[in-house]
Design a protein with these regions (language model features):
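Mobile cap/lid helix-loop segments that gate and shape the active-site cleft of serine hydrolases
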Residues: 204, 208-211, 226, 266-309, ...
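Short beta-strand/loop motif that positions the catalytic acidic residue
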Residues: 312, 319-321
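Alpha/beta-hydrolase fold nucleophile elbow
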Residues: 236-248
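Cap/lid segment of the alpha/beta-hydrolase catalytic domain
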Residues: 120-121, 127-222, 232-233, 278-281
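C-terminal catalytic histidine-bearing segment of alpha/beta-hydrolase fold enzymes
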Residues: 292, 338-380
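N-terminal targeting or regulatory segments adjacent to alpha/beta-hydrolase or S9 domains
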Residues: 17-94, 102, 138
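Bacterial Sec-dependent N-terminal signal peptides
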Residues: 1-25
């Protein structure tokens, strides 16, 4: 009898979880009226739809609105207080692990690669890691880790095979003559949970941040802006030649950073561009329709993704999406690319925006990494 009671108690939570009512309002984590919401998105602050006709004034106004929607930033530190935790000699460049005060609230660790080619200063890339639903590592996805636990090192190499074709993007760029910098985003790597990785807690943490009047996604962007400012102060870096790049969430970070930081001169984004009407509909059978990693409250009342990315105009920008990418349907990428081309063309600099659709799934193989480096070679 005791065993029967225990079994019944074990079954009850499962039964409660699967309870359904005849009527409902949400389906596949989306409101059933999602297409009506999409129809009401008018984007009044987009270039060409705004009543501001001077491009510089529009950029200033639109950027100010983006920052307003990003809510309060983390307070700046009094000093960076950069400490070199370790160094490793590599083939033609040196790897360093740094720790620095990124905000008054927190210290952050990063990897930096410096070419040893006789030059005192180099062009630099803020290389921004992906999401991948894999939070155990962050910066280690971009640069070969060292002085780390073997579990972390193995995880980093496994991730390269899965997403980057077995080539560490940062180390490849360092061999091509670039200073490369990569830091963890909030919740990734050495900025994760004390209790360990649990992606199901991400949304709860993001919600708690909003209760503080802060935005977790915005903190990621604010941090990327701040690390770019730090990068400009380092003696090995030519402060007038800083670019940024990333894949997936790293691509989102790259075009957001390009749009919001004047320090960035050139940007490249691989596999993250779409329009909200394609991202937030049930039509394409997607299992995920965005999330807190790119959720900035109220911003969609004013601009869509390509409108925000267009704040990077007239900078040279490269966008690559995959035709087999299940996360970003081709119609959404094509619509976004067309909108951005309209903006760059309106300013007489259409040749500075390059958008490409590749016959590939979601990821950044060595061929795409090479394409990005060639773009930087030409424009940075």
């Amino acid at each position: 009898m005791k065993k029967i009671v225990i079994l019944l108690l074990a079954i009850v939570p499962l039964a409660a979880f699967s309870q359904k009512r005849a009527l409902y309002e949400f389906k596949k984590n989306m409101p059933v009226y999602c297409d009506s919401l999409i129809a009401d998105m008018k984007y009044p602050l987009a270039w060409g739809q705004s009543d501001i006709h001077d491009f510089s004034q529009w950029k200033e106004t639109a950027r100010r609105k983006v920052f307003e929607c990003m809510m309060t930033p983390p307070p700046a530190p009094q000093a960076w207080n950069v400490v070199v935790l370790g160094e490793e000699q590599r083939d033609g460049y040196v790897a360093r692990k740094l720790e620095f005060q990124l905000s008054k609230y927190y210290k952050v660790r990063a990897y930096m690669l410096v070419p040893q080619d006789g030059r005192k200063k180099h062009p630099a890339i803020n290389l921004l890691h992906d999401h991948g639903a894999h939070l155990f590592i962050g910066k280690e996805k971009m640069i070969i880790p060292f002085q780390e636990d073997s579990v972390i090192i193995k995880d980093a190499f496994d991730w390269q095979l899965k997403v980057y074709g077995g080539q560490f993007w940062g180390d490849y760029m360092a061999r091509r003559g670039y200073v490369v910098f990569s830091a963890d985003a909030p919740l990734w790597g050495e900025r994760g949970r004390e209790e360990g990785v649990d992606r199901s807690k991400y949304d709860m943490i993001a919600g708690n941040m909003q209760m503080y009047g802060r935005c977790l996604s915005a903190f990621m962007t604010y941090d990327d802006i701040a690390t770019t400012e730090l990068l400009a102060t380092l003696p090995e870096v030519d402060a007038d030649r800083i670019g940024c790049a990333g894949c997936s969430m790293g691509a989102y970070r790259a075009w957001m950073l390009s749009a919001l930081s004047d320090r960035i001169k050139v940007g490249a984004a691989v596999c993250w561009m779409v329009t909200s009407d394609v991202q937030l509909t049930l039509k394409y059978g997607r299992s995920e329709n965005g999330g807190f990693a790119n959720c900035i409250p109220a911003l969609r009342q004013y601009m869509d993704y390509p409108h925000i990315a267009s704040l990077a105009c007239p900078k040279p920008m490269l966008f690559i999406n995959g035709m087999k990418d299940k996360l970003f349907p081709v119609p959404g990428a094509e619509k976004a690319f067309a909108e951005m081309h309209r903006v760059w063309d309106s300013q007489g600099v259409g040749e500075r925006l390059v958008t490409e659709l590749w016959d590939m799934p979601h990821g950044c193989p060595p061929e795409a990494q090479q394409r990005v480096v060639e773009f930087f070679d030409k424009n940075l």
